[in-house]
Amino acid sequence: MSDATSSKPQIFSIQDLKQAASDKMSQMYRDYYNGGAMDNITLANNEAAFDRYLLRPRVLRNVSNIDMTTTLWGTKAALPLGVSPSAMHRLAHADGEVGTSKACAARHVPMILSALSNDTLEDVSGQSSDGSTPYAIQVSPFKNRQITTNLLNRAKAAGYKAVVLTVDAPMFGRRLDDLRNGFSSGGLGGGIPDLSFDTSATWEEKIAWMKSQTDLEIWVKGVTSPLDAQIAIEQGVDGIIISNHGGRQLDTTPATIDILREIAPIAKGKTRIAIDGGFRRGSDIFKAVALGADFVFVGRIAIWGLAYDGSNGVGLALDLLINEFKLCMGLAGCSKISDISPAHLSILNARGVLESVY
């Protein structure tokens, strides 16, 4: 075996991938992608919280043919997994968002493209040559509404199925590592000239305006309160994404998987429920579905894949999660998504007794 071959990292898990990718990035960009707000308490808790939910497999079930497929934005998806919006993929690798999209399209994994992308939305969705992979465009409440209108019109023309409005970032969180490193994005290839956010935006006005601008599905990303989930339902959004921005906005907010357990009983059947934050294993996806999520999104994982090996690295990251999720379904006795239920989870209470999650 050559020295080059023997020194190549062995990637068997997302944690392996994170380490290998982090080793390849400069400290500034590594800290930008990997870090969170203030003391990183929410960032750490997002991951740790999954360990509080214990799997309860069912046995002697026919799992000879496991069907992971589901639907999102009216389109078939390979499994309840997609890529969250994250800015400036080219900071991780020259393949950028196009490289991420290429890996997603090859696996029919949905992708939400950030408004702060380096590559154009047309080039990104163009990686799905037959249009079978669903895409959504993410927008923020920009003061300059023409930016949003232009993005919505372009997205519609390019075959996008939904718009995802980020609602938890009226201003940027305080990220200490970025301040220490003097972080600079190096410019945005997407060419958006005015990134000022409208800090006066409200539910009633913003959702009504969005509906007046597009017939794409409208989802809101950044819901962490049951009260806001109820308002989202009342405003008639097509879906909510339970998200604390990967712990990058307001530190010490709860882990998203715990929030899902709180919101799912309120929102299930009234609007679609998705979640991101802290997912690192296929079993984490399974746990979210068992708690009531229709879909799971991951952000940093795609970035780690890019940093490690460009588009091929994103494919490796997705394959790890796909294979782990399929294995978890089989070992838990589930042959299709609808088989996954709260009965597949327990929590250990303070007295050391297993309890149902609902």
From Swiss-Prot:
Cross-referenced PANTHER family: 2-HYDROXYACID OXIDASE 2 (PTHR10578:SF149), S -2-HYDROXY-ACID OXIDASE-RELATED (PTHR10578)
Residue ranges occupied by any FMN hydroxy acid dehydrogenase domain in the UniProt entry: 6-350
Name this protein carries in UniProt: Oxidase FUB9
InterPro entries cross-referenced by the UniProt entry: Aldolase_TIM (IPR013785), Alpha-hydoxy_acid_DH_FMN (IPR012133), FMN-dep_DH (IPR000262), FMN_HAD (IPR037396), FMN_hydac_DH_AS (IPR008259)
Enzyme Commission numbers on file: 1.-.-.-
GO molecular function terms noted in the UniProt entry: FMN binding; oxidoreductase activity
EC supergroup of this enzyme: oxidoreductase
Cofactor(s) this protein cannot do without: FMN
Database matches in Pfam families: FMN_dh
Membrane-crossing segments per the record: none
Residues at the active site: 245
Assigned protein family: Belongs to the FMN-dependent alpha-hydroxy acid dehydrogenase family.
Record-listed a 2-oxocarboxylate binding positions: 32, 175, 248
Keywords: Flavoprotein, FMN, Oxidoreductase
Practical use: Fusaric acid is phytotoxic to plants such as cotton and banana. It has been shown to induce programmed cell death in plants. In addition to a mild toxicity to animals, fusaric acid exhibits acanthamoebicidal, antioomycete, and antimycobacterial activities.
Binding site residues for FMN: 114, 138, 166, 221, 276-280, 299-300
Task of the protein: Oxidase; part of the gene cluster that mediates the biosynthesis of fusaric acid, a mycotoxin with low to moderate toxicity to animals and humans, but with high phytotoxic properties. L-aspartate is suggested as fusaric acid amino acid precursor that is activated and further processed to O-acetyl-L-homoserine by cluster enzymes aspartate kinase FUB3 and homoserine O-acetyltransferase FUB5, as well as enzymes of the primary metabolism.
Pathway info: Mycotoxin biosynthesis
